[in-house]
A protein has these predicted regions:
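N-terminal Rossmann NAD(P)H-binding glycine-rich loop of SDR-like oxidoreductase domains
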Residues: 122, 130
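Substrate-binding pocket helix/loop in short-chain dehydrogenase/reductase
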Residues: 186-187, 191-196
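Alpha-helical segment proximal to the catalytic Tyr-Lys
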Residues: 215, 258-259
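Conserved core of the sugar-phosphate nucleotidyltransferase
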Residues: 1-72
Length: 322
């Protein structure tokens, strides 16, 4: 990888010279050599009482100078654990690891006859996802408070909805939860009932859907999809409850994806940029169209996640990449 930091050559406590950075690269592991080559290099090196090199490349270059060592392009996410502080950085890196679905095609043959349940399917992302799945010949069942009185914050209502679908279709392949509540206001202006309702829908609703979905998706080796927000990485003023529940959803998805992978259940989380939905318009008013993602594009990414092999991933959806 290109050297981005300032590299200095010192003489004691003073800079002797600064090498030309354009000629420097950062080496990464792994380093690979023919067994015969590396064995011969170390055979010579171990006879040298002044042996000081710290990596295999250095051993080969110093002790077998006629052997060319080819360099390939590295990857920024290939981080080396050297110092104690690196463990913290690597932990954060894996927490924020994301995936994108740009190259996954949507074929009717993959979705025809599949049974999908969408919670929060009455408008916005849920409505567009339902419509697109139906266009691909999937059987779609939508539930929401406004459509048929189903509140994901109430476990028994989620259970009844899934049971009704299963009794009718005898299988459930996909379960998608787009239900969410956003109230844009300072925390100290919020009453406890409003806070409770938001947590009940956004977070407890996620848990309820997951727990009630488990048996059906275990049988079908199905897919479970939830939604987060770009605010999950850093809390935002005036919607602390919303952003904190979205952070909780990411952590929850990553955890149950590991638990349920042995049973063939894939669990992912869609992370769209600011999206034009009725909920956003209600809270933020009219915004420039070119600054918002369309609900249709988020729906496409949602369906792509259903036909992907991903699990435990936070899937970014961006305006310029969909």
């Amino acid at each position: 990888m290109p050297a981005t930091d300032t590299i200095i050559e010192v003489d004691g406590d003073f800079i002797h010279q600064i090498p030309d950075r354009s000629k420097l690269k950062r080496g990464q592991t792994p380093q690979a050599f023919h067994l015969e080559t590396i064995s011969h290099a170390y055979e010579i090196a171990l006879k040298d009482e002044h042996f000081k090199v710290t990596d295999d490349c250095g051993v080969v270059v110093k002790y077998l100078p006629d052997v060319p060592v080819y360099v390939v392009t590295g990857e920024e996410s290939n981080m080396k654990l050297t110092y104690k502080e690196d463990t913290y950085l690597l932990d954060k890196f894996f927490q924020l690891r994301k995936s994108e679905l740009n190259e996954i095609p949507l074929n009717e043959s993959q979705l025809k006859g599949k049974v999908a349940v969408i919670f929060g399917g009455s408008y916005g992302i849920g409505e567009h996802t339902a419509r697109m799945l139906q266009e691909k010949q999937a059987k779609v069942f939508c539930f929401s408070r406004s459509m048929n009185g189903v509140d994901v914050g109430k476990k028994e209502q989620v259970a009844d909805a899934l049971k009704k679908v299963f009794l009718q279709t005898h299988r459930i392949d996909y379960i998608i939860n787009t239900a969410g509540v956003l109230n844009k206001e300072p925390l100290m202006s919020s009453d406890y009932q409003t806070i409770y309702n938001a947590v009940s829908t956004n977070y407890m609703g996620t848990i309820n859907v997951a727990m009630e979905a488990y048996a059906y998706l275990k049988e079908s080796k199905g897919k479970l999809v939830f939604f987060t927000s770009s605010s999950y990485t850093r809390g935002r003023a005036f919607y602390s409850i919303y952003s904190s529940t979205k952070a909780a959803i990411v952590n929850f998805v990553q955890a149950i994806a590991q638990e349920w992978e042995p049973f063939g259940i894939a669990v992912n989380c869609i992370n769209p940029e600011r999206t034009k939905t009725p909920m956003r318009v209600k809270n933020f008013g009219t915004e420039p169209e070119n600054t918002l993602l369309s609900a249709e594009k988020v729906a496409i990414a949602t369906i792509q996640s259903l036909v992907s092999e991903f699990t435990g991933q936070v899937i970014d959806v961006k305006r310029n990449e969909v």
